[in-house]
């Protein structure tokens, strides 16, 4: 199995920590005036989703995680699982609710997603960065009502709720950033 040393650390690097695959979110090399240099990292455990701050002594090696990121197409959902298909081999993968997590509210039929596999099973599903969804419910925006925050909640076709500007109406299609859950623009 491949290993990485602290000099290889960079955001996005996947390795094993306590028997669980992790990804480095951010890292910083620290050389104190007195004592040994170390690398300060913030890692996210891929299975549990926990974010931890971990320090590694300079030169420490860690085992590479045997995970694969695949570009898969979302097919359908049944009672307990979401199904994704590889666009070239047509192989199907089923992901449970824990693996899908918050991505559920951004999944559209035939959407291209990045699915992270560990030991052949999906552990995380990442939806596209931007999705276009129709507004199915929102309060009507009254003309001249600009006092306050200038936004209102809107329910989208997938059930997600986002804050939108007052001029957006029911039936319009909007673009949403799935990473932050924020309104980006109207789609013409």
Curated annotation (Swiss-Prot):
One of its GO terms (molecular function) is translation elongation factor activity. The modification N6-(3,6-diaminohexanoyl)-5-hydroxylysine is found at residue 34. It comes from the Bacteria. The keyword Cytoplasm applies. The keyword Cytoplasm applies. Pathway: Protein biosynthesis; polypeptide chain elongation. It is found in: Cytoplasm. SUPFAM superfamilies: Nucleic acid-binding proteins, Translation proteins SH3-like domain. Its main location: cytoplasm. SMART domains: EFP, Elong-fact-P_C. May be beta-lysylated on the epsilon-amino group of Lys-34 by the combined action of EpmA and EpmB, and then hydroxylated on the C5 position of the same residue by EpmC (if this protein is present). Lysylation is critical for the stimulatory effect of EF-P on peptide-bond formation. The lysylation moiety may extend toward the peptidyltransferase center and stabilize the terminal 3-CCA end of the tRNA. Hydroxylation of the C5 position on Lys-34 may allow additional potential stabilizing hydrogen-bond interactions with the P-tRNA. Keywords: Cytoplasm, Elongation factor, Hydroxylation, Protein biosynthesis. Transmembrane segments: none annotated. GO terms for cellular component: cytoplasm. Involved in peptide bond synthesis. Alleviates ribosome stalling that occurs when 3 or more consecutive Pro residues or the sequence PPG is present in a protein, possibly by augmenting the peptidyl transferase activity of the ribosome. Modification of Lys-34 is required for alleviation. Belongs to the elongation factor P family. This is Elongation factor P. It comes from Haemophilus influenzae (strain PittGG). The lineage of its organism: Bacteria, Pseudomonadati, Pseudomonadota, Gammaproteobacteria, Pasteurellales.
